[in-house]
A protein has these predicted regions:
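Hydrophobic alpha-helical segments
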Residues: 1-381
Length: 381
C-alpha cells in the first residue's frame, strides 16, 4: 500500500508516512503550482474553443478554488488539513496518470507542512491515501469497512464528505483535461505501470430493482427544511443532499455544474447511454438502475450492459458504427491517460460536432464523480 518517494516530495509517488526532508528539495515542475486556470491548469486552448463550455467550466474552476483554498481553517468538525486535501488530490491524479494534474498537485503539495511523525498521524494519512487510491481506481471495492477505518482515524462526517468530493472532482478534472488534450492533438503520454480500470462484476447488475440508502454517518449539519425543499437539486443529487449539505458551497457548485453540462444539444438518449456505461464500469448499481428505469429507448443496450464485458465486446464487433460512443466513454472512464485524438475523430466521423462530443464526454466524467459519491456514501439493497 505504501509508495515511497526517491527524492522527498519531489516525486509524484509520495509516501504515506511523514518524514523530515531537506529544505532545498523542489518538485519536478515547480512552476506547475502557479496557474491562472485552476481547472484546466493553463492548458493552451483558444478562447473560441472554450467559449461554448464556459457555463460549466466556470463552476468547475470555482470548485477547484473552494476545494483547495490558500488557507484552510480547522475545527472540531473540520479536521481535513490542507496537506491531506492536496495529498488526496495527488493520489487520485497518480491513479489516472494525466501528467498535467500530477505535476500541479505534486508542486502544490511540496511546500505544505505535513503531519507530525507520530504513529497515529502516519496511520491516518495511510488510511486516507489507501481509500483515495481505491475509490479512484476501483470504486466498487469501497464499503462499510472502509468507512469504519476512516472514522477510526478521526475523520468526521464533514471530513468524509469533503474527501469524497475531492476524489470525485479530481477524477472529473483528469478526464476533462485528457479530453481537451485529445481535442488539441496532444500525443498520449502513458505513465508505465498504470493499469486500465476493469469492469465491475456483472453479477452485481442482476438485480433490476434496488434501493440506495445513505450510510449511517453522524449528521453534523441539518439543512433547513424549507430551504432544502425549495432548492432545485438535480435528480442525480436528491438522495445525497442530506450528506452533501455538510459542504453547502461545494453542493451548490456541483449542482450548477451538472445543470450546465446537461444544457446542451446532446440528446437525452446519448446522456443516458454515457451514464449507463460509466455506472456499469464503476459498479454503481444504484446509478445504473436509476438510468435504466427512465431510458425506455435503450432497453436492448441496458440488457446488454448487465451482461459480462465479453458480451459487450462481441456486440461491438458486430456493430462498429453504434459502438463509437461506447468506446469513447469507456476509454475516458477506464484510462483517461490513454484517451486519444482518434477516439474523438471517430465521433466526429459519425456527424457529432466537437461541442456535442465534449459535452457528452464531460458528462461521462461527471457521472464517474456521481458513481463514486453513491458508492462511498451509501449502500444499495
Amino acid at each position: 500500500m505504501e509508495q515511497r518517494r526517491i527524492e522527498g516530495k519531489s516525486h509524484w509517488y509520495h509516501e504515506t508516512q511523514s518524514s523530515t526532508y531537506p529544505h532545498d528539495v523542489l518538485p519536478l515542475v515547480p512552476e506547475a503550482a502557479h496557474v491562472d486556470d485552476s481547472f484546466l491548469l493553463d492548458l493552451a486552448l483558444p478562447d473560441d474553443v472554450l467559449s461554448p463550455f464556459q457555463s460549466w467550466l466556470t463552476p468547475a474552476r470555482r470548485l477547484a478554488q473552494t476545494l483547495f483554498p490558500a488557507h484552510v481553517n480547522l475545527n472540531q468538525m473540520h479536521t481535513f488539513s490542507a496537506y491531506e486535501r492536496m495529498s488526496t488530490a495527488l493520489t487520485v491524479a497518480q491513479v489516472y496518470g494525466v501528467q498535467r494534474l500530477c505535476n500541479h498537485y505534486a508542486a502544490r503539495l511540496t511546500p505544505l507542512p505535513g503531519p507530525d511523525s507520530s504513529r497515529e498521524s502516519n496511520h491516518r494519512l495511510a488510511q486516507i491515501t489507501q481509500y483515495a487510491r481505491q475509490l479512484a481506481s476501483s470504486p466498487v471495492v469501497i464499503g462499510e469497512r472502509d468507512r469504519q477505518h476512516l472514522e477510526a482515524v478521526g475523520l468526521t462526517t464533514s471530513d468524509n464528505i469533503l474527501m469524497n468530493q475531492i476524489i470525485g472532482f479530481v477524477g472529473f478534472q483528469a478526464r476533462t483535461v485528457a479530453l481537451f488534450q485529445a481535442w488539441s492533438g496532444h500525443p498520449v503520454r502513458r505513465i508505465p505501470g498504470l493499469d486500465i480500470q476493469q469492469f465491475a462484476h456483472a453479477s452485481l447488475f442482476n438485480a433490476t430493482k434496488t434501493t440506495w440508502h445513505a450510510a449511517p454517518f453522524p449528521i453534523e449539519k441539518y439543512p433547513p427544511h424549507a430551504e432544502n425543499s425549495a432548492r432545485g437539486y438535480p435528480d442525480e443529487l436528491q438522495a445525497l443532499v442530506p450528506l452533501l449539505i455538510h459542504s453547502p458551497v461545494i453542493l451548490d457548485l456541483l449542482t450548477t455544474l451538472i445543470s450546465a453540462v446537461r444544457r446542451s444539444t446532446v440528446s437525452v438518449q446519448e446522456f443516458s447511454l454515457a451514464a449507463l456505461v460509466t455506472s456499469r464500469i464503476n459498479g454503481s448499481v444504484a446509478c445504473f438502475n436509476e438510468q435504466a428505469h427512465t431510458a425506455n429507448e435503450l432497453v436492448d443496450v441496458i440488457a446488454l450492459l448487465r451482461l459480462d464485458e465479453r458480451e459487450l465486446q462481441r456486440w461491438e464487433q458486430l456493430h462498429p458504427v453504434e459502438c463509437v460512443t461506447l468506446q469513447a466513454v469507456q476509454w475516458l472512464t477506464r484510462a483517461p491517460d490513454r484517451f486519444s485524438t482518434a477516439l474523438l475523430t471517430s465521433l466526429f466521423d459519425q456527424g457529432i460536432s466537437s461541442e456535442q462530443a465534449i459535452n457528452l464526454l464531460a458528462w461521462s466524467g461527471l457521472c464517474g464523480w456521481l458513481n463514486r459519491l453513491k458508492i462511498a456514501l451509501g449502500d444499495t439493497d
